[in-house]
Swiss-Prot record:
It is found in: Cytoplasm. ADP binds at residues 21-25, 154, 185-187, 211, 213-215. It comes from Anoxybacillus flavithermus (strain DSM 21510 / WK1). Pathway: Carbohydrate degradation; glycolysis; D-glyceraldehyde 3-phosphate and glycerone phosphate from D-glucose: step 3/4. The gene is pfkA. This is ATP-dependent 6-phosphofructokinase.
Amino acid sequence: MKRIGVLTSGGDSPGMNAAIRAVVRKAIYHGLEVYGIYHGYAGLIAGQIKKLEIGDVGDIIHRGGTMLYTARCPEFKTLEGQLKGIEQLKKHGIEGLVVIGGDGSYQGAKKLTEHGYPCVGVPGTIDNDIPGTDFTIGFDTALNTVIDAIDKIRDTATSHERTYVIEVMGRHAGDIALWAGLAGGAESILIPEADYDMDEIVSRLKRGHERGKKHSIIIVAEGVGSGVDFGKRIEEATGLETRVTVLGHVQRGGSPTAFDRVLASRLGARAVELLIEGKGGRCVGIQNNQLVDHDIIEALAQTHTVDQKMYQLSKELSI
């Protein structure tokens, strides 16, 4: 293999640039040419492809977002779109592809794999919901962003003696809510993977209020429902003054943490190694701090599961 490509797809996550940097530098170190594909699969179909040199990835390891930009691409879900993408890869002489992104990005890599095109997936999403890895690129940074917000909101919640509902990202996975809620000392955490008992939450808030606790923090993953609606229900049920903060896309931005920079560098470099070894159709990850790789089709057949013991711990500590 002499020439590979790299793209980022779907929602961006802090650390993607560090992964791109690792792919480019690792490939050049081994004598390969690297081509950046801009705007994800949409850019692949459109032929937005440019050769990358070492200088192109200088001064990006600390930057959030992705220098290759990203986009959603419904067209790539069709056979026609996939064949257009493969045509562009062949036109540019690209023999293997590194795809950095989440579940949708992996689905695209899976399709290319099924067409016989060598791809390696690198998990880049703040949701931490990709099977086959303990952590995804961007999760740690997003987690720290949320914890910082919780700490600051708790200051004002204490001053005004209010209950605050904080809505965080996570349509299908509650890792951000769970980890941030546990680290931030939240009184209640609501995640998509677990049913919640409104009466229990209300009782917990009232018990705390009765023993002199004048403020509370509730973390709600967006997949559970609207934080605004939940805040109204809490205020009506408890009579406690309640405010709602929806953190939104601030969770996707910012300079990646050291953990995400190192993780992205390790995973990006390993993806290149797999292509050099002729092992396409794989996805990389980290488990017990060891690099691993899995068949991408088998990985997509699995379902991410939340840590139920951690969820139970969060409930026990919020009495």
